A protein has these predicted regions:
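Catalytic domains of cell-wall/extracellular-matrix polysaccharide-remodeling enzymes
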Residues: 88-89, 112-240
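Residue-identity detector for glycine
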Residues: 6, 25, 48, 58, ...
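Hydrophobic/aromatic residues located in beta-strands of well-ordered beta-sheets
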Residues: 78, 104, 142-144, 167, ...
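Alpha-helical protein-protein interaction elements
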Residues: 10, 47, 73, 99-101, ...
Length: 264
């Protein structure tokens, strides 16, 4: 009897202590995924004639310095999406671009098609280029443009959510990589550019550089103001809701008058 009493004496406090332990609450719901339109940016709604010029695939040893000279003459800041392999060969050009107020973005190490690669391979392309940019200019890029604009939805999410990049596409494409001639490159840019546009070009093609003097002058004449992509994103304003169409009140249709029957 004494043994049972001793066992009960130790058991009761243990049961009380267990009962006083806080029970695990329900699991916190995971935050909803970021909508695709907030992960990738092709253009923005702005109050004002602001646009962003972007140049891909450099730096080019001969052409990028010529472009930088021209941009300096016009007091224009642009955004350069650079290739890691090219940075490794010419870090001094990237350093000059950053020093003169241009923005440097990540455009992969060797320009592969992300959508055809494993996630690990994509991460490697991005991180290697990130390290090359950081080594050249002393700061980490925050913008990324996937080569060809090709990237899967899953890749978009980990590039944005895990790696911390804004994914930048474009809404003006002069197809300058096809080298259609400087005049055509210029006319396409002038025709398609609107306030909030992100203009795609490549500073590795001579025709693109040849098209820029007339293009920049005409864009200035049209009243456009040039900013980097990050500056353009900061100028973003909500898109106003569409104006509802006026609803016309239905017109009452008069009832037909029935002639009295002759038969009464």
């Amino acid at each position: 009897m004494l043994r049972k009493f001793r066992a009960l004496f130790f058991l009761v406090p243990a049961m009380v202590a267990f009962a006083q332990q806080p029970s695990p609450g329900p699991e916190k719901p995971k935050p909803p995924p970021v909508p695709e339109q907030k992960i990738t940016v092709s253009s923005v709604h702005v109050d004002g004639p602001y646009i962003a010029l972007t140049f891909d695939d450099g730096p080019s040893e001969k052409l990028t310095p010529r472009l930088l000279d021209l941009l300096a003459q016009h007091h224009i800041h642009a955004t350069f999406f650079v290739i890691g392999e090219n940075i490794a060969q010419h870090p001094e050009i990237v350093q000059r671009a950053a020093r003169e107020g241009h923005e440097i973005g990540n455009h992969s190490w060797s320009h592969p098609n992300f959508a055809k690669m494993s996630d690990d391979a994509v991460r490697s392309q991005i991180k290697r280029t990130e390290e090359a940019i950081s080594s050249a200019i002393g700061s980490r890029p925050i913008l990324l443009r996937p080569p060809y604009g090709s990237v899967t939805m899953r890749q978009k999410h980990f590039i944005h959510d895990d790696l911390g990049y804004e994914i930048i596409l474009w809404d003006v494409d002069p197809l300058d990589w096809k080298e259609p001639g400087p005049n055509i490159v210029s006319s396409r840019i002038l025709k398609e550019t609107r306030p909030g546009s992100i203009v795609l070009s490549h500073d590795i093609h001579a025709q693109t550089i040849q098209a820029m003097p007339a293009t920049l002058t005409e864009l200035e004449t049209k009243g456009f103001k040039f900013v980097t992509v990050s500056e353009l994103l900061k100028l973003r304003t909500p898109v106003p809701p569409p104006t509802p169409k006026p609803v016309n009140a239905p017109t009452a249709t008069p009832s037909p008058v029935v002639a009295p029957s002759p038969n009464g």
